[in-house]
Amino acid sequence: MEGYKSFLAFLVSSLLLGFLGVIFTLVWVLHWREGLGWDGGAAEFNWHPVLVTSGFIFIQGIAIIVYRLPWTWKCSKLLMKFIHAGLHLTALIFTIVALVAVFDFHNAKNIPNMYSLHSWIGLTVVILYALQLVLGVSIYLLPFASNTLRAALMPVHVYSGLFIFGTVIATALMGITEKLIFSLKEPPYSKLPPEAIFVNTFGLLILVFGGLVVWMVTTPAWKRPREQGMEILSPTVSSPDETEEGSTITDCSNTEKSDVELNSEAARKRILKLDEAGQRSTM
């Protein structure tokens, strides 16, 4: 892999930022909000940001970059497809529970559903994500689609996945801003109390996390090799000079082998000529 150290830096940074985003969400709802529960109250609503951040953002981000991990390139493509689909399915389950939590809370408090832009885009992107998962499994995991169809739809599959991922992060940023505006009264959000600063920082974390994931998955040099027998490059890969040297040694060995074969053939012909001459002299 070209730029292995750069890839490793991006990977570690993205995982750290994503994990910090999950921690920030938990600290937010446990310290400044009402905690977590499942009673139709505010504590049930708090599952919504926690599950969206951990599942729809963090786990989905891992699912997107899992093919780019060079340590998995020796694994079979089928196994990686199962891992890729399994992570996406886990993210979808987290998201569905998050939707149930927010609808339960709204219904228990007689709060209208689906009136804000956040809710419109949020539900739309969940539906698109579910369709993406179903179509991805049907075309790329199950053995029904032809290779031609798979190759033709791959650019659409990749683009729609990145579009959904980016839309999820944008919708999450809208949601946390909306929550702060509704919840912070004394002092208001405009006064930037500690909770506002903390949650704004959380928003920056998931935004940068998304940017790093998109960068890793769109860098051609970090793409998983296509051929089964392709050499897997790692930090300990031989340098081009070493590869050239190995090629030279192989060529030299082949040359020596050819010389030996030629000498053996010449000796055999000389022996045959001597035998023929001996037979003539005897006659």
UniProtKB/Swiss-Prot annotation:
<feature type="compositionally biased region" description="Polar residues">
    <location>
        <begin position="235"/>
        <end position="253"/>
    </location>
</feature>
<feature type="transmembrane region" description="Helical; Name=4">
    <location>
        <begin position="117"/>
        <end position="142"/>
    </location>
</feature>
<feature type="topological domain" description="Extracellular">
    <location>
        <begin position="104"/>
        <end position="116"/>
    </location>
</feature>
<keyword id="KW-1133">Transmembrane helix</keyword>
<feature type="binding site">
    <location>
        <position position="150"/>
    </location>
    <ligand>
        <name>L-ascorbate</name>
    </ligand>
</feature>
<dbReference type="GO" id="GO:0140571">
    <property type="term" value="F:transmembrane ascorbate ferrireductase activity"/>
</dbReference>
<comment type="subunit">
    <text>Homodimer.</text>
</comment>
<dbReference type="Pfam" id="PF03188">
    <property type="entry name" value="Cytochrom_B561"/>
</dbReference>
<feature type="binding site">
    <location>
        <position position="81"/>
    </location>
    <ligand>
        <name>L-ascorbate</name>
    </ligand>
</feature>
<feature type="transmembrane region" description="Helical; Name=1">
    <location>
        <begin position="6"/>
        <end position="30"/>
    </location>
</feature>
<keyword id="KW-1003">Cell membrane</keyword>
<feature type="binding site" description="axial binding residue">
    <location>
        <position position="157"/>
    </location>
    <ligand>
        <name>heme b 2</name>
    </ligand>
</feature>
<keyword id="KW-0472">Membrane</keyword>
<keyword id="KW-0812">Transmembrane</keyword>
<feature type="transmembrane region" description="Helical; Name=5">
    <location>
        <begin position="150"/>
        <end position="177"/>
    </location>
</feature>
<dbReference type="GO" id="GO:0060586">
    <property type="term" value="P:multicellular organismal-level iron ion homeostasis"/>
</dbReference>
<feature type="transmembrane region" description="Helical; Name=6">
    <location>
        <begin position="196"/>
        <end position="220"/>
    </location>
</feature>
<feature type="binding site">
    <location>
        <begin position="113"/>
        <end position="116"/>
    </location>
    <ligand>
        <name>heme b 1</name>
    </ligand>
</feature>
<feature type="binding site">
    <location>
        <position position="77"/>
    </location>
    <ligand>
        <name>L-ascorbate</name>
    </ligand>
</feature>
<dbReference type="GO" id="GO:0016324">
    <property type="term" value="C:apical plasma membrane"/>
</dbReference>
<feature type="region of interest" description="Disordered">
    <location>
        <begin position="234"/>
        <end position="262"/>
    </location>
</feature>
<feature type="binding site">
    <location>
        <position position="178"/>
    </location>
    <ligand>
        <name>heme b 1</name>
    </ligand>
</feature>
<dbReference type="GO" id="GO:0005765">
    <property type="term" value="C:lysosomal membrane"/>
</dbReference>
<dbReference type="GO" id="GO:0031526">
    <property type="term" value="C:brush border membrane"/>
</dbReference>
<dbReference type="GO" id="GO:0016491">
    <property type="term" value="F:oxidoreductase activity"/>
</dbReference>
<feature type="topological domain" description="Cytoplasmic">
    <location>
        <begin position="221"/>
        <end position="283"/>
    </location>
</feature>
<feature type="binding site" description="axial binding residue">
    <location>
        <position position="118"/>
    </location>
    <ligand>
        <name>heme b 1</name>
    </ligand>
</feature>
<dbReference type="InterPro" id="IPR043205">
    <property type="entry name" value="CYB561/CYBRD1-like"/>
</dbReference>
<protein>
    <recommendedName>
        <fullName>Plasma membrane ascorbate-dependent reductase CYBRD1</fullName>
        <ecNumber>7.2.1.3</ecNumber>
    </recommendedName>
</protein>
<feature type="transmembrane region" description="Helical; Name=2">
    <location>
        <begin position="46"/>
        <end position="67"/>
    </location>
</feature>
<dbReference type="GO" id="GO:0140575">
    <property type="term" value="F:transmembrane monodehydroascorbate reductase activity"/>
</dbReference>
<feature type="binding site">
    <location>
        <position position="106"/>
    </location>
    <ligand>
        <name>Fe(3+)</name>
    </ligand>
</feature>
<feature type="transmembrane region" description="Helical; Name=3">
    <location>
        <begin position="77"/>
        <end position="103"/>
    </location>
</feature>
<dbReference type="GO" id="GO:0016020">
    <property type="term" value="C:membrane"/>
</dbReference>
<keyword id="KW-0349">Heme</keyword>
<dbReference type="GO" id="GO:0046872">
    <property type="term" value="F:metal ion binding"/>
</dbReference>
<feature type="topological domain" description="Cytoplasmic">
    <location>
        <begin position="1"/>
        <end position="5"/>
    </location>
</feature>
<keyword id="KW-0249">Electron transport</keyword>
<feature type="binding site" description="axial binding residue">
    <location>
        <position position="48"/>
    </location>
    <ligand>
        <name>heme b 1</name>
    </ligand>
</feature>
<feature type="domain" description="Cytochrome b561">
    <location>
        <begin position="13"/>
        <end position="218"/>
    </location>
</feature>
<keyword id="KW-0560">Oxidoreductase</keyword>
<feature type="topological domain" description="Extracellular">
    <location>
        <begin position="31"/>
        <end position="45"/>
    </location>
</feature>
